[in-house]
Structures are given as C-alpha cells and as structure tokens.
Amino acid sequence: TSKDDLSPVLGGYWPGIQIYYPPIKFNPLDGTYETMEQAKFRLQKHAYKTKAHTLLFDLEDGCRMKEMSRKLLLEELPKFPERDFQIALRVNPFRTKEYEEDLTLIKQIHKHIDVIVLAKAGEVYGDAEIRDLSSWLVSIGSKVTIQPIIEHPKSLKIADKLMSHSTVKHVVFGIHDF
C-alpha cells in the first residue's frame, strides 16, 4: 500500500533479494559448460519465473564463457516476458578489453536491463569510473542505473564520490573483501 511505501527512505526502488545467475553454467560432474541451447532452456525455465527482486547476470570474474554469455543475453533478454523484477548485468572492470565488449552489448540491450553492477568500482580510476559510465549511458539515451561494488578500502574512502552521481541509487559492499 502507499502508506507502506519506503522508497523515499530507501532512495527509490530497493534491489531486494538479488539472485546471481551465470549465463553459461559449468557442470563440475563432467567438466563441461552448457551449450547455447541448454543455457537458453535453463534461462527460460528458471529466470523468467524468478521470485527474486533482481536477476543478476554475471559477466565478470564468475563468468568464464564471456563471449558466449554475451551472445546468449543479446538473443534472450529481448524475449523476456513482462516482468516484475529488475535485470542487472555485472560488468568487467573499467577500461579493460572485456569492459569495452560489455559496453558494446549494453548498447544493444540497454532497454532490456535496469542496472549495471560495476565490480571493483573506484579501485583504479576513482570516481571517474562512475562519471564516465554515467556519461556514456546518457549518450546512448539509456535510463539504466549503476550499482558500484565496493570491494577495497580505497573505494570505501571515496564511497561518497561514487554515490554522488545521479545514476547511482545503491551500492554493494563486498562482504568477503574487508
């Protein structure tokens, strides 16, 4: 109900329960990765019907099959049925080759995602990482927000700067990083 609306206190929509979803899954029993068809089937079976508030697709260090994962997301995210949860993409660290490839994907699918999760935010280039990504999102006409992950004391020291950008609504603290 409207009287229970906590968005003014929480800074808007709260990401709530975020389910980590590897686009291409590894099967440790036989040491292989899913095929594209298996990954599509799993996505349609489980991701379409998630009860989580945010479905987080990882392209960063938890993702070994990056090119195939990007291809899967490019093909499948536009097919998602109407949903009542957010879709987030965890991208690779700022100014890396993989980050640039992630941006190429985002340019094509930004209308189908809600949040970019920036791993290791601010560790190398400070708040310029958020500033540049924010500017880039504006340049492509995107309404996607940024959720920085603070994983290092250096980033914690500049958390106020990371959060000062209008595209940042929430930050994540890496619980194993401190």
Residue map of PLM features:
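Conserved alpha/beta-domain cores
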Residues: 4, 9-178
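Short, Gly/Pro- and small/polar-rich lid/capping loops
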Residues: 1
